[in-house]
Amino acid sequence: MSIFEVRQQSNGAVLWTGSAFDEVSALDAMAREAGYIDFQALPEEIRAAHPVARPIV
């Protein structure tokens, strides 16, 4: 596992930081921590902001 940071692409705001296996699982982990089942369950306006997960080196 690696440490990932999820940022809102439009303004660079950090939405989540934590460990995950890859970018997809980082987005899912962010959504679960916010109380959703996975990334696809997030409201459309959040997904439309195009959150981006990147590993922290």
Residue ranges and their predicted role:
Residues A26-M30:
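Short amphipathic, charge-patterned alpha-helical segments
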Residues G12-F21, R32-A34:
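A short, exposed loop/beta-hairpin motif centered on an aromatic-Gly-Thr core
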